[in-house]
Amino acid sequence: MAAILLDVDGVLHVSGEPIPGAVEAVARLRVEGHRLRFVTNNSTRSRAALVEELRGMGHELEDADLQTTPIAAAEQLGGRRVYALVMAAIVPDLTGIELVGDSADAVLVGGCDETVEPNQVFSYMNLARAFSEIQAGADLFALHRNPWWQTARGPMLDGGAFVAALEYATGVEATVIGKPSAASFAAALAALDAEPELTWMVTDDLEQDVRGAQLFGMKTLLLRTGKFRPDALERSSTVPDAVLSSIAQVPDWINRTL
């Protein structure tokens, strides 16, 4: 049986609206004995809230089945003084991190949501403070570096754009905690006790997830849902193992490869 990493936003749902056939496909993969791990770069809601949302759609999973960037950040930055540009909802998941307004030894940048909160989190003054902290020697960390994500209203600017701005202004490269970092993929495979060459990454994100998974030695399935753009695929040097219409086709595809 295969080990499968499932992206969430754009694969299972878009803005909370389930992708047709997603619940049935995931359930079938479980019944057929495949090992599944949900891996998301969503950094605007707690893991508990994200799990509850998926359960509400009909998915069966435990909290530990969902790998999130705030939980990973807490493990990586625990005990450090951190100036964090993040949504308030994820603060409970940053257990062990000392959140400070100045004299930080690390700056952490999260993602955006569809509310007005990013207007405050990523204000000029907050970005300027992050710039100053990095200039003073703080390390720069990003929960992810996605420049945008797909919503029901269309593409929306994401936190990766602000990460790039801070990198440009400071000359400091961010350490990425979520996908496509090697650490993120390594943690996911360790949870499944899986080898990269026997693992599939299922996603709608060509440049972050597909490219990153391939560099880590995994096989990849790109779905034509969520943020998928045909023109981006045509222009890209990244070639997934297969392009499927949606997650509904994944069980049949995986089974044919075994």
What are these model-derived regions, one by one?
Residues 2-8, 13-23, 27-34, 43-67, ...:
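Asp-based, Mg2+/Mn2+-dependent phosphohydrolase catalytic module
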